Structures are given as C-alpha cells and as structure tokens.
C-alpha cells in the first residue's frame, strides 16, 4: 500500500474532533508538543472513524497537563498518579490528555511507575507496534504521522508484535488485549507474541489487569471469536466455556442481540469455581443470578437472556405451559390457574414431564382428578 501520511489520519477524524484538537493545539503554546496516539491513529489508518482519543502532552509536567485541560474549557478529571487528565467531550465521550512518560515495572503484573519522558519514549513504552503510531499536532501546518517502532509495517501485515521480549512478562494483560484486537480487526500474532504466551500464563494470577481485560473481552462485538483466538494461542484456560461463547456468537450473527452479561453467565456455567472467577473478573452479582434463573424451571419469554442461556445449557428443555394455555385447555380462570401451574412445575422438577405435549397430557389427567379446577 502507499505510505500513509498525517492528512489521511486527520481526514478520518470527526469534524468536531478536528476542531477541538486544533483549539487545543493553539492553547498549548510553543513549548508543548501534542500528539494523537494509539488506537485512534491505528483505526484511522484502517479506514475507520476514531472515537476514543488519547493525546500525549510532551514538554510539560503534571501541572502543565492540568492547566491545558483547564484551558480546553471542557469538564475534566485530573489523575495525579500518572499526571493525566480525562476530558468530557460535548457528546459525552472521554478524551485523555496523557503526560509523556517512560515506565518502570518494579514487579511483573503490578502497575508501572511513571517516569518523565519524551513523545518518542511514550511511544516505545506501548504494547504493540501498531498501537505505537502517533499524529503530531501542529498549531500551524499539516499534522505529521510518526512511526518510531515500525508500526506501519505491522499494520500493513496486520500483525500484532510486542515491542520487546519482556512485554507480556511485565504485563500479562497484553495477551488478552491482543486477542481482543486480533478478533475485532482480523489481525494475526507475530512469532514474538506467541513466544511470550507461556510467560503470560505463568503470571496471570499475579496480574489483576488481565482479569479486567477478560471482562472487557466479554463486551467485544463477538466474544466467542476473541476467546477462540486465545484458545488458538494456547491460552484457552483463561476463559472457560468456549463452545457456549461461540454458540452465543452464532445467535448474534443471526440477528439476535446477546448482552455481555449473558456471555459472562455462560463463562460462569463452565467455571470450576464460578464464585471465585466472578470475583476475580469483577463481574458483580448479575451474571450468577442470570445463570441461576436460566437453570431454573421458571417461565421466560422467547428472546430473553434466560431462555438464550437455557437453550444452550439445557438443550432438552422446552417452554412450559403458560396460564393462558392452561385456561385454553380447560382450567377455570382465577386461583385454579395458579394451582394447575404449580402442579405442572412439580412434575417438571421431578422429571415426570419432559415436553409441552407431556404437560398437556398431565394437565388433562389433573383436570380429570380435580373436576373443580374446570
């Protein structure tokens, strides 16, 4: 492909984003270097419209970053630990102002210690080459595309390449992030990435961010596809329930929406210790509650998450008779309906009925033995 330039990236941004980035550049001053970095540049080069914007601020300390956020006129929250600021754009999206830094990992899996750095330092600390591209913003003149680590070559090859041989050792969550990107953008792993997978797996328990990344994986457009990528890389043990996740993907592909919570419940159904996994991934209580309802004999309407899961976990299950149906079969409206449904529920729980037809037969026998129910 032709070598891309900054104008190509700039053109992919939304007009309102170009406007406020221009305004930010004017307010930054001559001693400050600003650059749009990471996923926004990558996605723009892939022909997509970037929505998540990260801007590196070089030449300023934390006070300078906070002052620039204030000068933007947008609501913001300042994060002192990394001297970053999160702006709230008019449409509700967030945009991060990130002080240029280097990073030191005192211990694998733990948060890195930030150190002052240049724009080039900031790009070299990133996870993969195609995420280390930058668009240098200028108050006057065309934006400049920067590639200091060979990210353009990786993007052309659609290859995920870690930037050094201890990348996944320092932060094993990069393994899951790579799988998410590979599934979403149809990327493949560089040999250097696959070589580091065993190291990442060995450090998974010591890397809280890895479990947070797995939760984010369940919110991907096709979580089953991302889980299949992990499995293909030899990391399938991180996320149980692959066949269920892929089956839910099939439902999505057929036009039936599937919520992240349904995927999470499917994972818990296959976990040796569901409670421990839910806590580690910070899933909250809802997926476990959804799973319990799906495994119950309660009635749920077609298309509900409970029924989506039940069809996978209990393929022999069926839709029990409803109150309207038992009335149509001869039960008198009123309290008799509840008693008839309770009788059928007891038969289901005992295994005495295993289909809607068997419920109808059992209901007729019930009515014969209880004529007052008619």
Swiss-Prot record:
EC number: 2.7.7.-
Reactions mediated catalytically: a tRNA precursor + 2 CTP = a tRNA with a 3' CC end + 2 diphosphate
Protein name: CC-adding tRNA nucleotidyltransferase
One matching Pfam family: PolyA_pol
CDD domains: NT_ClassII-CCAase (cd05398)
Family, similarity comment: Belongs to the tRNA nucleotidyltransferase/poly(A) polymerase family.
Enzyme class: transferase
Binding site for CTP: 39-42, 126-127, 131, 171-180, 209
Superkingdom per UniProt: Bacteria
